[in-house]
Amino acid sequence: MILEHADITIAPGQNAAFEAAIQRGIATVIAQAKGFRDAKVHRGIESTERYILTIHWDTLENHTVDFRGGPLFPQWRAIVGPFFAKPPVVEHFELAAGHG
């Protein structure tokens, strides 16, 4: 299983609208994607326009090829993209250690 970590900065004053949009986008678009497991969105405390979106995928290719290269990605970006103050920084991680 792969963890996608997206660091998102939105325009000031758009928190409520962005949070509604990202929830809708996850539920209606990303949840349909091949290999999707779960997603969480965290809002920054010190920087309230900053969000961390984490998504678990079965494989890296489920995100980078199937989702990003398929018809769902433009739908996703149409929902959340207008809120971005700058392009998100996206990285992928694999579990190295765990407890619980």
Where are the predicted features?
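Short, flexible segments with low predicted structural confidence
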Residues: 1-2, 18, 34-36
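Short, well-ordered beta-strand segments in beta-rich or mixed alpha/beta enzyme
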Residues: 2-9, 38-68, 93-94
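Short, surface-exposed ligand-recognition loops at beta-strand->loop->(often short) alpha-helix junctions
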Residues: 9-22
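Feature targets compositionally biased, intrinsically disordered low-complexity regions
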Residues: 12, 24, 34, 43, ...
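Intrinsically disordered, low-complexity segments enriched in polar/charged residues with Gly/Pro
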Residues: 14-16, 27-30, 41-44
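Residue-level signal for secondary-structure boundary sites
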Residues: 16, 61-63, 98-100
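An amphipathic, aromatic/His-enriched active-site/gating alpha helix that lines ligand/cofactor pockets
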Residues: 24, 28-36, 56-89
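Glycine-rich beta-strand-turn "strand-cap" elements at beta-sheet edges
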Residues: 40-52, 75-100
